[in-house]
Amino acid sequence: MINFNEVLETNKMIEQENLDVRTITLGISLLDCISSNLEELNQNIYDKITTVAKDLVTTGKKIERQFGIPVVNKRISVTPIAMIGASACKTPSDFVTIAKTLDRAANTVGVNFIGGYSALVSKGMTSSERLLIESIPEALAVTERVCSSVNVGSTKTGINMDAVKLLGQIMLDTAEYTKEKDSLGCAKLVIFCNAPDDNPFMAGAFHGVTEADAIINVGVSGPGVVKTALESVRGEDFGTLCETIKKTAFKITRVGQLVAMEASKMLNIPFGIVDLSLAPTPAVGDSVAEILQEIGLEYPGAPGTTAALALLNDSVKKGGVMASSYVGGLSGAFIPVSEDQGMIDAVRAGCLTLEKLEAMTCVCSVGLDMIAIPGDTKATTISGIIADEMAIGMINQKTTAVRLIPVIGKKVGDIAEFGGLLGYAPIMPVNNFSCDNFVNRGGRIPAPIHSFKN
């Protein structure tokens, strides 16, 4: 029987505590669009996306009205374009035409982001994958809604250090191409280890080749709800703390499951997964950092931060798994700097460093996310940071990622303004001791011993 108090509680979560469905992401396979003729390929891609996704935005709005739950973003992910363009694209410029087509299709159907301008190169790069990677800076500069990701490592295959080296330079080039907007292009580029096929969150979403022709994946956001729940158990022991987070995560995920099933039914597209992630926004009261403070830290970055984040992440998963028949994506707690006011405050207070953020990524959901660094940082230094983060994912059998923003023309202490959901970020210092000889070795780092399960 429905408890009236729980109805009021859910209503309060939405009205006062920033509970929302962050994204309904429609994954679309473009494998049947492949052609050796570039013009024909672009037309096929545009036609497929605008046909399959034509009702996505209106469906999201209908669900909002029906349940009173904000559905903040409606998005699309597609099959990695390095595969789709392999026959037709002979130069980086050819791939850029596909990026423009994706942007046009996204604009036509009304979604705010389209992910999948991607390459999966964890063991090696084909010529088309290298061309796509080389096209990323221009592609992200000439489009508004296209997001790019590159998977450079996995627990099963090791880390492709040739790709890591190349991407250090690509990240700087992307920053240079968009320097008039505080190097915003880099906010739409994610480097992965163990990238999931069903991630609904941008900028790392792509539609994996293991997926159906089309699929609905949903991501929910509720850091404010968790923080409010923890306010009622101040001073209690860790068992009570974890139990409170679990119960709250269950309720949050149940909302995502409801929306995902309804969207699937209305669009007649199979339901894929609910992503259990706690995704913050720059809004006050919608912060993962504030949860960590409520757990007992003065600021994120203080001693105990990694343990507090591990506890939070694990409890969210335990509660969320009970609420949905299928969970997936990234599933945990995001710790982006620019998208979380509490993280920004911690950086400004001198409590949170790049190295501490790296330690936190060992126990959380993604990785070094939305971190602004000086624009004069060397490409090899960026590659070294990427390699470190990929190693954490490879050894620990988890998804890790890097979304750094080298802001051209800015130095430590300056502020980079990205606007909207991406927020703003203080420029953080980077360790500038050289790793050139390490990065320049080339080849790949072998898979760890515990990857051999057969």
From Swiss-Prot:
Q: Report the family membership.
A: Belongs to the UPF0210 family.
Q: Which InterPro entries match?
A: UPF0210
Q: What is this protein called?
A: UPF0210 protein Cphy_2797
Q: What is the lineage of its organism?
A: Bacteria, Bacillati, Bacillota, Clostridia, Lachnospirales
Task: Tell me how this protein assembles.
Answer: Homodimer.
